[in-house]
């Protein structure tokens, strides 16, 4: 292809194509990049292409740009797609395409390597994020650029990852460059330094609070186009990343990467304090707060602080009353997903927690934990008033009401108060007449489950309650309690009229008839 001469006094100018300023990664190199680095690559390549177009250079759209604009995952782009399959339309640098400052400013972003001054006086390639130090390039025409590249190859900087960059103005010259991590782009406000100009530009958006990328669906705005693109998946429901092991699909590649650790058992994040390992870095961050005691998430309503943001979110529902987790079977709603999970076991009758001692199974792990105390005899909850021990914290709470006299549960029908909610529930059946507990032997129904249990012993003949004094056995604990008063002489039931005392409540009821004159028994 012919070359067009430049301005008087200059040498012939090379041909600029998109391939000349493209960046190519091998598959191995690409896999070393994380999600943020891949997004940055996409943004830089799109910006480079737009810069060429904005300069008036007639460049046909390469396949790579088409893929990137369609948000195609870059690791799925074959290497032959990284460079246009067909040569892009070439263009000469003519006099009317060389506005001095425009070319300099644009190439500062487009050309990812540094040269001092090369060739024409008006075309100076400035330092950009891919360079370190000042590089002297031989003066002369663009035909000497290849020599310039060879001269500077030995000065190219070091890094952990290779990045292939196409030679400038030469499709045949490709050399590996390395990056030292030197940071030459500095934020004027806080002094933070960056190794890439695009990183500095993204950082400065934090100060301006500019959010130029807006979601058309929900109106949410973002600082970075990559964040905007990632957000869109929420609305589309797209899940392009599928696990080869179990087939589960994910919206983001990072989620798939984390999920795979479920199958591999990999836990790459280790706590330096205690050595505990985690699959996610966020889990390690949350765990570290156990050691530091940090609780950065505070409830604005009550001031309670939490170490994990999700715990604060769950806590807020106490104040709002929100119950977003609904059972599909019965429609019952819950504030927390864990409560819904436990509730579902009522419908499925699943009991995944089995006692190793006796084999009894439970739907809740907490129930199994309490059950184990039957075997161990552990009673970790002690009353500070009387020293009595209990297996359950709820039992201690109920017991304390004996000392305080608290009766927080009131019947709306008759105003009677109770210390237990279950006792109030049982009491309400007196007003409703409900008898939900039915004997399968004789069909007799009862309002209390305990009464049905006692009744069944009539059919079985079981008498599990034995008096330690005389050895007499009873089928009800209440009957044993009444019997013991024969030995103790206790008379807890006292008449308010004459103060006569009785061992049994039924005896007091009969005695009261003397004072009232009531004659309830009539001859038919």
From Swiss-Prot:
Residues 16-87 form the KRAB domain. Keywords: DNA-binding, Metal-binding, Nucleus, Repeat, Transcription, Transcription regulation, Zinc, Zinc-finger. GO terms for biological process: regulation of DNA-templated transcription. One of its GO terms (molecular function) is RNA polymerase II cis-regulatory region sequence-specific DNA binding. Its main location: nucleus. PROSITE patterns: KRAB, ZINC_FINGER_C2H2_1, ZINC_FINGER_C2H2_2. It is found in: Nucleus. One of its GO terms (cellular component) is nucleus. InterPro entries: KRAB (IPR001909), KRAB_dom_sf (IPR036051), Znf_C2H2-type (IPR050758), Znf_C2H2_sf (IPR036236), Znf_C2H2_type (IPR013087). A zinc finger (C2H2-type) spans 185-212, 213-235, 241-263, 269-291, 297-319, 325-347, 353-375, 381-403, 409-431, 437-459, 465-487, 493-515. It comes from the Eukaryota. Expressed primarily in testis and fetal tissues. Belongs to the krueppel C2H2-type zinc-finger protein family. May be involved in transcriptional regulation. This is Zinc finger protein 479. It comes from Homo sapiens.
């Amino acid at each position: 292809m012919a070359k067009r001469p430049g301005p008087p006094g200059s040498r012939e100018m090379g041909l600029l194509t998109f391939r000349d300023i493209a960046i190519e990664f091998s598959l191995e190199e690409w896999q070393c990049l994380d999600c943020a680095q891949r997004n940055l690559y996409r943004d830089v390549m799109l910006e480079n292409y737009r810069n060429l177009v904005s300069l008036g250079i007639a460049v046909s759209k390469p396949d790579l740009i088409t893929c990137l604009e369609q948000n195609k995952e870059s690791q799925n782009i074959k290497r032959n797609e990284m460079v246009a399959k067909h040569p892009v339309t070439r263009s000469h640098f003519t006099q009317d395409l060389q506005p001095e400052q425009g070319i300099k400013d644009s190439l500062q972003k487009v050309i990812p390597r540094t040269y001092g001054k090369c060739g024409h006086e008006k075309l100076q390639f400035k330092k950009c994020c891919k360079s370190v130090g000042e590089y002297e390039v031989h003066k002369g025409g663009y035909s000497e650029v290849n020599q310039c590249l060879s001269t500077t190859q030995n000065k190219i900087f070091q890094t952990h990852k290779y990045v292939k960059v196409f030679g400038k103005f030469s499709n045949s010259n490709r050399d590996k460059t390395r990056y030292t991590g030197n940071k030459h782009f500095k934020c004027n406000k806080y002094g933070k330094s960056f190794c890439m100009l695009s990183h500095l530009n993204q950082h400065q958006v934090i100060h301006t609070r500019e959010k130029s990328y807006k979601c058309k669906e929900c109106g949410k705005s973002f600082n970075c186009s990559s964040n905007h693109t990632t957000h869109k998946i929420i609305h589309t429901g797209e899940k392009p990343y599928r696990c080869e092991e179990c087939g589960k699909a994910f919206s983001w590649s990072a989620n798939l990467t984390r999920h795979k650790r479920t199958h591999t058992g990999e836990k790459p994040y280790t706590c330096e304090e205690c050595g505990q390992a985690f699959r996610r870095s966020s889990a390690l961050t949350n765990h570290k707060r156990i050691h530091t005691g940090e609780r950065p998430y505070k409830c604005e309503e009550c001031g309670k602080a939490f170490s994990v943001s999700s715990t604060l979110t769950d806590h807020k529902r106490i104040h709002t009353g929100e119950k977003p987790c609904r059972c599909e079977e019965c429609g019952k709603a819950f504030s927390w997903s864990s409560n819904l999970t436990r509730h579902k076991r009522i419908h499925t009758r699943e009991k995944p927690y089995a006692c190793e001692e006796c084999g009894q199974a439970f739907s809740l792990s907490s129930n199994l934990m309490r059950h184990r105390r039957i075997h161990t005899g552990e009673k970790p909850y002690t009353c500070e008033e009387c020293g009595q021990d209990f297996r359950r914290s709820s039992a201690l709470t109920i017991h304390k009401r004996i000392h305080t006299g608290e009766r927080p549960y009131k019947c709306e029908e008759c105003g009677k108060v109770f210390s237990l909610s279950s006792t109030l529930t049982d009491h309400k059946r007196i007003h409703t007449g409900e008898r939900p507990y039915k004997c399968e032997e004789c069909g007799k129904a009862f309002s209390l489950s305990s009464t049905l249990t006692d009744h069944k012993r009539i059919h079985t003949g079981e008498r599990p309650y034995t008096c330690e004094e005389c050895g007499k056995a009873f089928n009800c604990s209440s009957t044993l309690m009444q019997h013991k008063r024969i030995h103790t002489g206790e008379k807890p039931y006292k008449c308010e009229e004459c103060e006569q005392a009785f061992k049994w409540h039924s005896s007091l009821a009969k005695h009261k008839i003397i004072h009232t004159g009531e004659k309830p028994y009539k001859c038919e």
